[in-house]
Amino acid sequence: KEGYLMDHEGCKLSCFIRPSGYCGRECAIKKGSSGYCAWPACYCYGLPNWVKVWERATNRCGKK
């Protein structure tokens, strides 16, 4: 599975002002194989199916 990691509000995990390697570490924490900053958000590869990733159809970012 691949996709954009989400923060606690359902938004894409920002990497806009993060140090180099931030997204790779965040993806590894979620058991992903790799990841990078697809400016301005973290994109991961090889994620297990239990990890929730951002999807346009189910986007809840900024909504209450």
From Swiss-Prot:
Disulfide pattern? C11-C61, C15-C37, C23-C42, C27-C44
Tissue specificity as recorded in UniProt? Expressed by the venom gland.
Q: Name one GO biological process term.
A: defense response
User: What GO molecular function annotation could you give as one example from this UniProt entry?
Assistant: toxin activity
Q: Which Pfam families match?
A: Toxin_3
Which InterPro entries does this UniProt record tie to the protein?
Answer: LCN-type_CS_alpha_beta_dom (IPR044062), Scorpion_toxin-like (IPR003614), Scorpion_toxin-like_sf (IPR036574), Scorpion_toxinL (IPR018218), Scorpion_toxinL/defensin (IPR002061)
List all membrane-crossing ranges: none
Which Gene3D superfamilies does the protein's record reference?
Knottin, scorpion toxin-like (3.30.30.10)
Has UniProt tagged this entry with the keyword Nuclease? no
Give every LCN-type CS-alpha/beta domain span: 1-62
GO CC, alphabetical: extracellular region
In which broad location class does this protein mainly occur, judging by the first location in its UniProt entry? secreted
Cellular localisation: Secreted
What keywords were assigned to this record?
Amidation, Disulfide bond, Ion channel impairing toxin, Neurotoxin, Secreted, Toxin, Voltage-gated sodium channel impairing toxin
Give all Cysteine amide modified positions. C61
In UniProt terms, what function does this protein have?
A: Beta toxins bind voltage-independently at site-4 of sodium channels (Nav) and shift the voltage of activation toward more negative potentials thereby affecting sodium channel activation and promoting spontaneous and repetitive firing.
Q: Which family does it belong to?
A: Belongs to the long (4 C-C) scorpion toxin superfamily. Sodium channel inhibitor family. Beta subfamily.
In the UniProt entry, what is the domain comment? Has the structural arrangement of an alpha-helix connected to antiparallel beta-sheets by disulfide bonds (CS-alpha/beta).
Name of the featured protein? Beta-toxin Tf1
